Amino acid sequence: DLSSKYDIIDFDLGNKITGAGFPVYKNKGAKLQRSLINFFLDKNISKGYNEIQPPLLVNEDSGFGTGQLPDKEGQMYHVQNDNLYLIPTAEVPITNIYRNSILKIDDLPIKLTGYTPCFRREAGSYGSDVRGLNRLHQFDKVEIVRIECPTKSYQVLDEMVEHVKSILSDLELPFRILRLCGGDLGFTSALTYDFEVYSKAQKKWLEVSSVSNFESYQSNRLKVRIDYGDKTKKLAHTLNGSALALPRIVAALIENNQTDKGCLLYTSPSPRDQRGSRMPSSAW
């Protein structure tokens, strides 16, 4: 196991402290996590997204507004005494910033990005599909959220897809894009693209991002409307995507950067990175 070989991720220690699905990142593993989070945020900000650092707990209204509740209540951690939920994605608190809002047409587009830990009960504790970094109860993710005029939302979706493509290209990872068919779509989404990177060790593709257009589904629940200035108010369209989710990206970077001298990984940003080139490598 490469994470043990390089002493960068400790699953046994996480199991001791909390339980299965809560790894401890150590040494250069922790540095890699931090560097990637900053790298993703900087890439998003360079495209006009404004950074948000939201709460990690949300109330029931917030979970309902974005569609996690009641549908996915069994997959969310619930603090019963306070009736609050640990977020499964930054999409929930960030989109809820504009709950019960009337936006002027000149306020659009709204482009937000944020890093948060994410918490999901859905992960199992055994089996090949949940081993290592494949499925975790707690993981790090950087999200992008858009609130848009309905006439522009599909153009914006294409822009978001291209943006995620550019990040994966900078990381020089083998990836593919899937347009989900109707039967695979979540009930909140009108159109979703999944991004998958190839795992050499597992010899299969692993999802690292989903980019979705929810059209007016979320805005109808959230009551987010646009004032067009002629006494016309219509529901906005909301979109979001992962840019990016870290665990499987970390696994793919480790697997795809093995050399005879060790592992070449992205450990720190540089002036070249700030000009839009890939992050530099250093040997472990």
What spans do the regions from the language model cover?
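Structured aminoacyl-transfer and RNA-binding surfaces used for tRNA recognition/handling
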Residues: 22-247, 251-265
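Conserved oxyanion/phosphate-binding beta-strand-loop segments in alpha/beta enzyme cores
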Residues: 1-18
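Conserved small/polar residues in nucleotide/adenosyl-binding loops
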Residues: 266-273
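Intrinsic disorder/low-complexity detector
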Residues: 196, 273-275
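Hydrophobic alpha-helical segments, chiefly the membrane-spanning helices
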Residues: 277-284
